[in-house]
Amino acid sequence: MKNYSMKVFVSVAVLGTLAFILMMLQFPLLPSAPFLKLDFSDIPALIGGLLFGPLAVILVELIKNVLLYIVSGSPVGVPVGELANFISGLFYVLPIYYLFHWLRSTKGMVLSTAVGTVLMTGAMAVFNYFVLLPFYIKLGGLPANTDVAWLITYAIVPFNLLKGVIVSAVFLLLYSRLKKWIAKNQTMKERRKFEKRQQEISH
């Protein structure tokens, strides 16, 4: 963090706040699972990563979930849902950041978002199966006879795949318009990474 300037910290805080606002605008995606809601709060984290690096991704995801917990609380008393969203965001955004670092093209960005979607879906299936759903069942948030495997297969996995596709499509549209602006406003460290990788690709 010592390499982050005050300007970068302020920018990350703004992106985190924007992510929180977008998260508050969530809406159900699958009629069969109305408790699973889509939002576009990972897009500011993606932009933050491209501008300032992977630490910005973590901070934006953290800020939005801390703000959400402060404002909305949790029906079970502990921020389990916020933890799930934090993990989901990291497994989606960080793979995109790191893979795009090597591919550096429009096709590379499309592939990166596809990989991020698959990794996020897998991570959330595992987290829900072993942690989140058993926790909710234990606290009475779900019936004791809930078929966790069925819920994972027919709700959690389809939801996260659809979420990844929709969020990726919106981000790719934004990225096509913001690409030059992002390149102009990147930190020097991220710009050097980009230039170094461009030289490697050209050779």
From Swiss-Prot:
Keyword line: Cell membrane, Membrane, Transmembrane, Transmembrane helix, Transport, Virulence
Pfam family, one: ECF_trnsprt
Biological-process GO terms, alphabetical: riboflavin transport
Changes seen on gene knockout: Mutant lacking this gene is completely avirulent in mice but has no detectable growth defect in nutrient-rich media. Deletion mutant shows only a slight defect in growth in media containing riboflavin, but does not replicate in chemically defined media with FMN or FAD.
Topology of this chain in the membrane: Multi-pass membrane protein
Gene3D superfamilies, per the entry: 1.10.1760.20
A GO term, aspect molecular function: riboflavin transmembrane transporter activity
Cellular component annotations (GO), alphabetically ordered: plasma membrane
Location(s) in or outside the cell: Cell membrane
Main location: membrane
TM ranges: 8-28, 43-63, 83-103, 117-137, 154-174
Stated role: Substrate-binding (S) component of an energy-coupling factor (ECF) ABC-transporter complex. Mediates uptake of riboflavin. Can also transport roseoflavin (RoF), and probably 8-demethyl-8-aminoriboflavin (AF), toxic riboflavin analogs. In addition, during intracellular growth, binds and imports FMN and FAD directly from the cytosol of host cells. Essential for virulence and intracellular growth.
Subunit structure: Forms a stable energy-coupling factor (ECF) transporter complex composed of 2 membrane-embedded substrate-binding proteins (S component), 2 ATP-binding proteins (A component) and 2 transmembrane proteins (T component).
Protein family according to the UniProt entry: Belongs to the prokaryotic riboflavin transporter (P-RFT) (TC 2.A.87) family.
Protein name per its UniProtKB record: Riboflavin transporter RibU
Source species: Listeria monocytogenes serovar 1/2a (strain ATCC BAA-679 / EGD-e)
